[in-house]
């Protein structure tokens, strides 16, 4: 059975085409900085927003009528969903996908039933991967939707909930390994608090760290070579989450000795919810040595929640890609579309329109970022700004050649009189705009 029979395979037709079901800027075979666009972008489609979400919101019921979401045998519907998903991936021409365990398999009425259902669907996903050539970018476990996780998973006051969550992660990590996944993501949607009045912060942080340590141990025990990634988010659904932003996650990892084992998966909309730019979070992840992968989406600046819209800003993404390219690009990570069509977008074509447009935006942004990397104008000005630290005096300070007292004595003896230099922000912004809009 075909679920998108009337929709052709999406091909590159160039910027002059007016076909809404074609790529206008994404030519997967085009080479930029020595790699193809497909190799740079490593695009993934997410299971949950694309095939699981029924179009409900907090004010209204499900608006979609997907064939695989209709009542019936749960495992049969899961197989239908997988068939639809892989037909979609294949027609879109995207190389990767991502999932939560309960996206792909019915949870059932017990932990044993969950494990059995998931095992059957992992077998089926393996068959679909082999037939299509589509690969798994990352897997994860849903530890936030069921009411048992209302007070958290790893941070729950009930150790039985901790054990249930550990079971899900054990199975999800095993499945990710078996399916050739390149990363495993841990998102602590309920790992936080609603009120401090009933919360023991130290205990919950210790529990969370113990849980992560167990995941790390299991990764090495089964021989999984992919990266473990935490996805930062400041709040929603909880009032405050312990993985607030990149810097918070890094500090947590260092505190518990996990900084060499876990990196971050950065979502654009989560960055803005934390009061940061997407550019900031990516740059900070590289500065702290924890960059892993990206969830590509956007929020609505007039809304204070996670709207998970498709990315449409070449300007925003150019700066994100600039950081990624200047640091060597993705290794195990990629660009996962953690994005969903709007509730009123009920037609099957809308799923394609959202992804096609966003993929074109990624391609445009990456090519503009490549211009910034190739012309080296931003980096040259940055190097010039810090050049004095590369002189003998600056190197001596950083190498521990002075104490605080001896440095003060030296400064007094030399009568240092620092002169302020321009930060040249306006010039730098002009350089970025020239690259984005093809002015130079």
Swiss-Prot record:
Family per record: Belongs to the xylose isomerase family.
GO MF term (any one): xylose isomerase activity
BP term (GO), one: D-xylose metabolic process
Note describing how the cofactor binds: Binds 2 magnesium ions per subunit.
Residues that bind Mg(2+) 2: 267, 270, 306, 308
Annotated keywords: Carbohydrate metabolism, Cytoplasm, Isomerase, Magnesium, Metal-binding, Xylose metabolism
Active site: 100, 103
Localization annotation: Cytoplasm
Binding site for Mg(2+) 1: 231, 267, 295, 338
Assembly and binders: Homotetramer.
Organism whose genome encodes this protein: Burkholderia cenocepacia (strain ATCC BAA-245 / DSM 16553 / LMG 16656 / NCTC 13227 / J2315 / CF5610) (Burkholderia cepacia (strain J2315))
Protein name: Xylose isomerase
Cofactor needs: Mg(2+)
EC id: 5.3.1.5
């Amino acid at each position: 059975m075909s679920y998108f029979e009337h929709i052709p395979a999406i091909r590159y037709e160039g910027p002059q085409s007016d076909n809404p079901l074609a790529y206008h800027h994404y030519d997967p075979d085009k080479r930029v900085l020595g790699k193809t666009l497909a190799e740079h972008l490593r695009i993934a489609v997410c299971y949950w927003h694309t095939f699981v979400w029924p179009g409900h919101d907090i004010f209204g019921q499900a608006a979609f009528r997907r064939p695989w979401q209709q009542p019936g045998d749960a495992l049969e519907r899961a197989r239908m969903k997988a068939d639809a998903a892989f037909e979609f991936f294949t027609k879109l021409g995207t190389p990767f996908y991502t999932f939560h365990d309960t996206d792909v398999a019915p949870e059932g009425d017990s932990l044993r039933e969950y494990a059995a259902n998931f095992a059957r669907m992992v077998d089926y996903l393996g068959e679909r991967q082999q037939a299509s050539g589509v690969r798994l970018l990352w897997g994860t476990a849903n530890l936030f939707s069921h009411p048992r996780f209302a007070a958290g998973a790893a941070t729950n006051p009930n150790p039985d909930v901790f054990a249930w969550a550990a079971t899900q992660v054990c199975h999800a990590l095993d499945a990710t390994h078996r399916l050739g996944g390149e990363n495993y993501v841990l998102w602590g949607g309920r790992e936080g608090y609603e009120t401090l009045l009933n919360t023991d912060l130290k205990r919950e942080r210790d529990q969370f760290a113990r849980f992560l340590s167990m995941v790390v141990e299991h990764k090495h025990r089964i021989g999984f070579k992919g990266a473990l990634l935490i996805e930062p988010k400041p709040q929603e659904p909880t009032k405050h989450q312990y993985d607030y932003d990149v810097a918070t996650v890094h500090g947590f990892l260092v505190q518990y000795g996990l900084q060499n084992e876990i990196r971050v998966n950065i979502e654009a909309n989560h960055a803005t919810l934390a009061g940061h730019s997407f550019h900031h979070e990516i740059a900070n992840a590289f500065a702290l040595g924890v960059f892993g992968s990206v969830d590509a989406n956007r929020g609505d600046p007039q809304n204070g929640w996670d709207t998970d819209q498709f990315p449409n800003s070449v300007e925003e993404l150019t700066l994100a890609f600039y950081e990624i390219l200047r640091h060597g690009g993705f290794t195990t990570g990629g660009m996962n579309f953690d994005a969903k069509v709007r509730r009123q977008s009920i037609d099957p074509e809308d799923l394609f329109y959202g992804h096609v447009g966003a993929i074109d935006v990624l391609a445009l942004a990456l090519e503009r970022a490549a211009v910034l990397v190739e012309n080296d104008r931003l980096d040259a000005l940055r190097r010039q700004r810090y050049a004095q630290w590369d002189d003998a005096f600056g190197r001596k300070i950083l190498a521990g050649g002075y104490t605080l007292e001896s440095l003060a004595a030296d400064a007094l003896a030399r009568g240092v009189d620092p002169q302020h230099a321009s930060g040249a922000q306006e010039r730098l912004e002009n350089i970025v705009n020239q690259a984005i809009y093809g002015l130079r």
